[in-house]
Amino acid sequence: MSERGEFKTTYGAPMPPYETADDAYRAAVERLGAPGEPPFTRGVRPTMYRGRLWTMRQYAGFGSAEESNARYRYLLSQGQTGLSVAFDLPTQMGFDADDPRAEGEVGKVGVSISSIDDFALLLKDIPLDQVTTSMTINATAAILLGMYVAVAKRQGVPLTRVGGTTQNDILKEYIARGTYIYPPRQSMRLVTDVIAYCAEQLPRWNPISISGYHIREAGADAVQELAFTFANAIAYVGAAVERGLPVDAFAAQLSFFFAANATLIEEVAKFRAARRIWERIMRERFGASDPASLALRFHTQTMGSTLTAQQPRNNIVRTAIEALAAVLGGTQSLHTNAYDEALALPSEESARIALRTQQLIAEESGVAETVDPLGGAYLVEKLTADIETRTLAELDRIDAQGGALAGIERGYQQRAIEDSAYRYQREVETKARVIVGVNAFQTEGDETKITTLRVDESVAARQRERLVALRKRRDAARVGRLRADLRSAAEGTANLMPAIVAAVDGDVTLGEICADLRASFGAYVPPDRG
């Protein structure tokens, strides 16, 4: 009987009809190791989910700080175990809500934060010594972390008990997402300032979440996702070491963020290969010796780009498959997308279903009862080894460019992602890749009539009014001194975090801080790549 077609991985390798225990398989199994031990192929903890489930961390944020705070408290009441904050585009790009460049975007794709007042409202009645918070923020990460620190101090929480993560991965913004402000080398200074500050002041805070997720969503395949992410990670670790930080003093605080696609077996292999690659990088390139420095800890999010506006309830199934891949792959925390996200921000109902998807996997599927349940499977082990080999080869190519930063400046990673995205789209258009409800199994009068969340259009006006009131009541002379101190620090070489924390606590706004840093650092203009 003939086969249905040609079967390949997302990165173009042929998928065999079946696998056997040949020499390649036996070699792969010999390198496995035990869970919780280098090279961590089988997981970063000996008991994995038998000891503690992954953190269920739903990404949320919209409109005003008050509205987002209500959503966070609702999710926590429904069993969520950590917060994940989405910020609107003006906040990500360094503009206050009353800046003309923020017009039409305030509160639309995340929560609007311009000042410490907004941030205090965002975290109202949420005890920061009991809940960890992940903040998806990059160009303005140092400022938002400064606000978090200031609010924690106001709550009376010792910084040694404050836990969470700032994404703070600016390099991937230049190749995959675009929310950059300053040139790459000046941005790298801010990243390393945050790493150094956290190593000294915030021992439970992950100063960076090096993100393959956005690279994958931009069109990269599984191998490119790992290779470009690890190339960025090598650049960050190298920069921190050059600043005089011993690698074992901060490496255990590094975290990662990956995508989970619906290609379940390939994704499980990808996550397992990632742990093995990172252990090797830290041991061989940087001489790390603390096992905690060698262990890859990562958050996973199901892929937004796989969600369809057509037949949107199918997305519940897509997300469940992707979430299962993340769990089988040993993620430390997980966000499951809501089924309506191809149409709007998640409604309360869709957010609850997304959270329940994780809870069903955790409590009813049985996959959390055994560590690395797919370990030893012929296909899984050989795919793990194949992805590892191909990723290391791609890292060699990036090294030949001069590393991640030089590659970005030459456009190497950007071109590779664009080419991969084009190949994927051609497969969809030619139906070589089936997307249920999009290019196959369509229905007439698609069932897109679902209730979606709409952001209150008055949010922008209320945010502007709040800023007017802030500027009237604050101590203008103190604000002037704090901004002068920040500019002086930016012109020098000292860590900027103390000046930023002081500025936000003294009612200097996010937009004002970014304006001062733009004046010192300049603004990044991407090269014309023709």
Name each region found by the language model.
Residues 1-261, 266, 285, 292-299, ...:
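Catalytic alpha/beta active-site cores
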Residues 5-17, 21-24, 37-40, 89, ...:
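Flexible, glycine-rich loop/tail regions that form catalytic "lids" or insertion modules at the edges
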Residues 62, 71-78, 116-126, 147-151, ...:
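Generic, well-ordered alpha-helical scaffold segments in large soluble proteins
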Residues 103-108, 172-182, 215-220, 258-263, ...:
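Short beta-alpha connecting loops at secondary-structure transitions
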Residues 114, 132, 137-140, 152-154, ...:
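Phosphate/diphosphate-binding loops
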Residues 159, 190, 345, 527-530:
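Catalytic or ion-translocation cores adjacent to nucleophile or general acid/base/metal-coordination motifs
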